[in-house]
């Protein structure tokens, strides 16, 4: 069935086909019954007419056979008065001619008639049949020589010594009886013997011809069954009724009717039935159309509501008014529950979208702040690196001075004073270095805590995106259950689920980057703590050097030993400075990586904000 047809039209079409089929079957069944009834009535009618005609013909011949038999008996008793007996009024009025064929070849006839010269009855077939018969017998129709008319002879043997007496019966009466049967203009009757020869027929040209000449294509059998035959382009129904009680004559009354005329009533009935069927089908289809329109009204209301949600303002606050508890009422309740569930889901998605947007803004703000702190940390790290370089240069200078002190003992005081100044500068540099290391450690700790906060925020984003994904999946499932009507919801739900999935992936990437930043920050904190410890050691050594330089004037004799100690301490200080320099460079690299990670986080948060805005726009298309 065409998919573009409306459901009500499909119902109406199916109902129309059922009604048409039912009426067609009813008409065909009635046609079958009417045909059988007409055929049965026709068979009964023809059988009755055949039996009645057979009785009339038998009655026609029985009386005359009695007359001939009585005449034969009377002549046998009184052969001398044969001609007188043949002239009785009863015989003259009943027969066309009465005659006597004698065994000596003589022939008497009443009324008198001149026979051909040399006429010998003994050579005639009727004489031979009469002499051979044990009782009265009938001849087939033949032309009487005296009257030149078609007659049937009734013969009876007088005796073997006298001859045969007979009476010719004109066929006019028999023809009148047979031709009187026209069955209301539908057909005719005819007389035929058991050999199929036609004895009497309305068409005189067919008399004495066989049935095969009349019906060459299909010669009917002489039975009482109704047989269809073709004759002159017409279909005719034939039946035969035997004429019983006639001596030596096996005759049948053939009844022939035109099939089209016989079943003309059936054609009229068919036309009336077709007209009635068409009128009834039109009326029923019209009533069905009105009934379907009334019954489908709740569905039309539901369709308009769904179209308003799908193509209009997306108003999810509308509900259907249920007025019945039938299938449409159940469907309406289901639709209201579905819209209520979608309404709740859209509200939750809207709220979650606002939260995601706020979280994204907070993450962006935190990322910008972290970027600023990272820049500050980078600047200070560069300052620490410069100070470390100065500290290294100072240590090298101390080593040179210590070597010169060993070589130039004479200028120990001057060198001690210079060493005192260098130590003071060293102490000041160490103090600055210690302060910078403490500050860097605090900044890195702050960065670490910020990354922890960012990780918590990302966990919130991940949880929200997972909830959004579940809500979108539930909405898609409910839309799939709604079929074609929920296709718009399915598209929106699928878009929301994709956005949530992308948000979750971005949050996971940011989480991974932040975890790497946290690891780097923890390593930087450990390194700065170690650097601070080394710085404190250097400060202690520098203080010791200062104390020793304070007493250099009174302990000049110990300059060589002290210079060795200073050289050793200076070498250690140089190693520590180099280590600190390496740590500072590594901190700087980690800080750069942190900046790059923060930039990636910022970009991801910007994408998250855009997707949240898009989701908010989609949710805003519904009225909640």
Swiss-Prot record:
Record's bilayer topology term: Multi-pass membrane protein
Organism annotation: Pseudomonas putida (strain ATCC 47054 / DSM 6125 / CFBP 8728 / NCIMB 11950 / KT2440)
Gene3D superfamilies found in the cross-reference section: Methyl-accepting chemotaxis protein, PAS domain
Protein name according to UniProt: Methyl-accepting chemotaxis protein McpG
Primary localization: membrane
Domain called HAMP: residue spans: 293-347
GO cellular component terms, semicolon-separated: plasma membrane
Inactivation phenotype: Deletion of the gene causes significant reduction in GABA chemotaxis and reduces root colonization.
TM stretches of this protein: 11-31, 272-292
